[in-house]
Swiss-Prot record:
MF terms (GO), sorted A to Z: lysophospholipase activity
Disulfide feature: none
Entries under Gene3D superfamilies matching the protein: SGNH hydrolase (3.40.50.1110)
InterPro entries: Ester_Hydrolysis_Enzymes, GDSL, SGNH_hydro_sf
Organism: Bacillus subtilis (strain 168)
Lineage, opening ranks: Bacteria, Bacillati, Bacillota, Bacilli, Bacillales
Pfam families: Lipase_GDSL
Top-level lineage group: Bacteria
Name of the featured protein: Uncharacterized protein YpmR
Length: 255
């Protein structure tokens, strides 16, 4: 009788051990699946010349350089880049661009959406008021720009509600050519605040500040000698480093 009880108890112990082992193994596999980095990542990029990569000798710009950094992750097999940025585009041009079916398809498929905008909006105001330049025209343009910026985010989110949306801030491109226009620094700061305020409303959106990379005379080595306006290869590498750091902080997208 005692032998039979001992045999039953031993069987129960073995059964419980097996069940626990199966459950632990299953939970481990499930956890591994939940935290697995995506093997195939898609980046869509829209906006102006800064996102297009104008001034970079190798043509990659910050978008291509960030893609290269993501490719260096051992868990990532491919990074597909769809860059729809156009030199000279203002915020109203970008809103029109977002109506393009090809652009919409690219954004829908994206894990990341990178964009820059606003620099050409400022440039338009500067050209129109160059002979009598004051801060007033820029201040008057802030509200309309804020509405367009908000609309840009809204349009992107209608196409894709889960992608990480990364806006690269504006910098003062006249630091190296028209340094006497000190007021532009304040205008750029104000317009970046507008963008940051709107982006904070979206939990999957962020601004990457780069204005400090191009705000000193000594930073001129980061600007293209061809136009004294856009970043060169070094400048774009520094921008890409900032963007990639922001991405790594949040972690690459999961399966």
């Amino acid at each position: 009788m005692k032998l039979r009880i001992f045999s039953i108890m031993a069987s129960l112990i073995l059964l419980l051990t097996a069940c626990t082992s199966i459950r632990t193994s299953s939970e481990g596999k499930q956890k591994a699946h939940e935290t697995k980095t995506k093997e195939h990542i898609v980046i869509a990029a829209v906006g102006d010349s800064l996102t297009e990569g104008v001034g970079d000798p190798d043509g990659k710009g910050y978008v291509g350089k960030v893609a290269d950094s993501i490719r260096s992750d051992k868990q990532v097999k491919t990074v597909d880049v769809k860059n729809y940025a156009v030199k000279g585009n203002r915020s109203d041009d970008l809103l029109e661009k977002l109506k393009d079916k090809k652009v919409q398809k690219g954004i829908k498929d994206a894990d990341y959406v990178f964009f820059t905008i606003g620099g050409n909006d400022l440039m338009k105001i500067l050209r129109q008021n160059f002979l009598q330049l004051t801060v007033e025209p820029f201040q008057e343009a802030e509200k309309p720009y804020e509405k367009r910026f908000e609309k840009i985010i809204s349009e992107i989110r209608e196409l894709n509600d889960h992608a990480e949306l990364i806006y690269v801030s504006m910098y003062n491109p006249f630091t190296f050519t028209l340094s006497e226009l000190n007021e532009i620094n304040g205008v750029v700061t104000d317009w970046n605040h507008i963008a940051e305020k709107e982006l904070k409303k979206d939990k999957h959106a962020k601004i990457v500040h780069i204005e400090d990379l191009f705000n000193q005379k000594s930073d001129s080595s980061r600007i293209s000698e061809e136009d004294d306006f856009h970043p060169n290869g070094t400048g774009y590498s520094l921008i890409a480093k900032r963007v990639y750091q922001a991405i790594k902080k949040e972690g690459l997208p999961k399966e």
